[in-house]
Amino acid sequence: MRIDVVTIFPDYLRPLELALVGRAASRDLVDIQTHDLRAWTHDVHRTVDDSPYGGGPGMVMRPEPWDAALRDIVARDPSRRPRVVVPTPAGVPFTQSYAAELAEQDWLIFCCGRYEGIDGRVVDAWADDEISIGDYVLAGGEVATLVMVEAVTRLLPGVVGNAESIIDDSFAHGLLEGPVYTRPPVWEGRAVPEILRSGDHAAIARWRREEALRRTCRRRPELLDRIELSDADRAVVASTIVAAHGGGDDPPVTGVEDAVTIAERGTIGDGPAPSGCASSHCS
């Protein structure tokens, strides 16, 4: 894969030379090039911004340098067409599935805006994707680009030594990954769950699935609405609700039918569904 990044702060992207992404580049699994947008300016001050039409605070990045930069970069490999990405808080959310989609591409160009953003005409003319990494505002697109490039690169074949690491990632199956443990077996009085030391691979897989369901229900309940849950999964979700309510006035969940009834009813005892688990499976 080829990745080009256009920015007014090329040094901001130097972390891409380190760790996993840096090793991938050194092994020619990905070719990452950064470009200084100011190289495509033609005035003594190397100006890339101007005041916004319609008034308002801040400055807007001018279209001419961006268009010149993108034309020049694309012309260097006319046999391929890149997918152009603009990081912006006004974009669609970046997700693991989005990372997987981008990882299927042959060539990506990231356009790192600054100030109030890039002139909308450039975005309309060039951008294939406008992507947000979260509901907050950064000073520019560089940090978001670092996030996306790492998320995409680690999905490329051969980048991660153990491919199962990717399969077991948070979000790989639509759920958050559960807790992980290593040696020593007991630390500061806290023991590793016995099941993980049992050698029973089927039981360990079930435990991990259940922990992933519990963590997702507590922290990102909306994710549960996007996946198909088995009856056993729904039992775990329902028991998580019961625990969040301290049991309420309901009898214990003793089987799948009880769990499904509770999950579909949406309340336990006379209390509302817990704020920590607000998906349709949990509330």
From Swiss-Prot:
MF-aspect GO terms: tRNA (guanine(37)-N1)-methyltransferase activity
BP-aspect Gene Ontology terms: tRNA N1-guanine methylation
Binding annotation for S-adenosyl-L-methionine: G113, I133, G134, D135, Y136, V137, L138
GO cellular component: cytosol
Pfam family, one: tRNA_m1G_MT
Keywords: Cytoplasm, Methyltransferase, S-adenosyl-L-methionine, Transferase, tRNA processing
Enzyme Commission code(s) on record: 2.1.1.228
SUPFAM superfamilies with a match to the protein in the record: alpha/beta knot
Domain of life: Bacteria
Substrates-to-products reaction catalysed: guanosine(37) in tRNA + S-adenosyl-L-methionine = N(1)-methylguanosine(37) in tRNA + S-adenosyl-L-homocysteine + H(+)
InterPro entries in the record: Alpha/beta_knot_MTases (IPR029028), tRNA_m1G_MeTrfase_C_sf (IPR023148), tRNA_m1G_MeTrfase_TrmD (IPR002649), tRNA_m1G_MTases_N (IPR029026), tRNA_MeTrfase_TRMD/TRM10 (IPR016009)
The UniProt record lists the keyword Transmembrane helix: no
Compartment(s) where it occurs, according to its Swiss-Prot or TrEMBL record: Cytoplasm
Subunit structure: Homodimer.
Task performed by this protein: Specifically methylates guanosine-37 in various tRNAs.
Family membership: Belongs to the RNA methyltransferase TrmD family.
Protein name: tRNA (guanine-N(1)-)-methyltransferase
Natural source organism: Parafrankia sp. (strain EAN1pec)
Gene this protein is translated from: trmD
